[in-house]
Every structure is written in structure tokens, then in C-alpha cells.
């Protein structure tokens, strides 16, 4: 073969190999996750207070230039009242935390990302005198290692909300990719 032909073939093989090596390890663009949450999924089981609590959580994860992600959470819950009590009582439910945990369904997990509920005066606990919650949190920073782990195995993570009446957890649900 002529040297020019060998050079062209070598460059072609080299560039084909480079495409595979340079392929991104994580998906680009917004990734949507969701969770159907209920008290029956909480471990250990949620108490009889707020037993009817259920709802859904939608999560949109957007890549940032640093390899990290920002996430937006939309949370809708209902049934957050003391069982057998009129919903408008002042001692209705108070959501004190929303947390993403790493853990399998039916098992206790480790907290990996906490929403800013009740942590500052700007984001107080969510009072629910009517027994419902609809709230959105935007631009929640998700470190790159955590984002990669969640995107690789969403069902290995769950979302759980905690209330003043059920500090160990009022609703929980595993994350799933949409």
C-alpha cells in the first residue's frame, strides 16, 4: 500500500476509536424523575396520624456546566390531616422536611439531599391547615457524583417528607425515570 493510503486508514481507525472514548458518560439535557408517595411506603411504618397522606413528586434534573446538576421539585400531597379530625384545626399537619435518601424500597436509607423546608425564615415549615400541599423548589444544587448515582439507578433512591406529627416520615416513594 502507498504511504498516503496507510495514513488515511490509520487516521480513520484512530478517529473512530476516539468517538467511543469521548462519548459522554451521562445523558445530556433535562432528565425527568417522579415518585408516587404514600404513608404505606415509610419504613418504619408511619403512625396512624396522617394515615391517608399520599401524592406525587416530580423532579427535573438539568445539567450544569460544572458536571453538577440543578433540580426542580414539584410536590403535591393530600390527606395530611389528623385521622378523624376536621382539617381546619390549628394543629393540622406541618411539613418540616423533604429529603432524598439513598436506599432500596422497604429499607432505611441514608439522606443525600435535603430540600430547604423549615431551614430558614425565607422557607418556613409548610403549614397545611386544609390537609393539602402544592409546592415547587427550583435550582436545588445536586453535586455531580450524586447526580450520576441517581441517574444511573433512580430506584436506588427515594423521596420522603417528614411532618411534625410523623417526624420519622409521613410519605415516601422510590424515584423512577420518566
Regions found by a protein language model. Name each.
Residues 18-98, 102-178:
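Metal-centered catalytic cores of metalloenzymes
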Residues 13-17:
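C-terminal motif of bacterial Sec signal peptides marking the signal peptidase cleavage site
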Residues 2-8:
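Sec-dependent signal peptide recognition
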Amino acid at each position: 500500500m502507498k504511504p498516503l493510503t496507510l495514513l488515511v486508514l490509520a487516521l480513520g481507525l484512530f478517529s473512530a476509536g476516539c468517538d467511543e472514548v469521548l462519548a459522554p458518560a451521562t445523558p445530556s439535557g433535562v432528565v425527568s424523575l417522579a415518585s408516587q408517595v404514600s404513608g404505606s411506603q415509610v419504613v418504619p411504618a408511619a403512625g396512624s396520624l396522617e394515615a391517608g397522606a399520599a401524592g406525587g413528586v416530580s423532579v427535573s434534573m438539568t445539567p450544569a456546566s460544572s458536571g453538577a446538576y440543578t433540580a426542580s421539585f414539584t410536590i403535591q400531597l393530600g390527606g395530611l390531616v389528623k385521622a378523624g379530625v376536621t382539617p381546619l384545626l390549628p394543629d393540622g399537619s406541618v411539613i418540616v422536611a423533604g429529603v432524598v435518601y439513598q436506599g432500596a424500597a422497604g429499607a432505611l436509607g441514608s439522606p443525600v439531599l435535603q430540600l430547604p423546608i423549615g431551614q430558614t425564615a425565607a422557607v418556613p415549615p409548610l403549614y397545611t391547615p386544609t390537609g393539602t400541599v402544592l409546592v415547587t423548589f427550583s435550582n436545588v444544587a445536586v453535586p455531580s457524583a450524586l447526580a450520576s448515582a441517581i441517574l444511573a439507578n433512580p430506584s436506588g433512591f427515594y423521596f420522603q417528607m417528614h411532618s411534625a406529627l410523623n417526624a420519622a416520615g409521613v410519605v415516601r416513594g422510590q424515584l423512577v425515570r420518566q
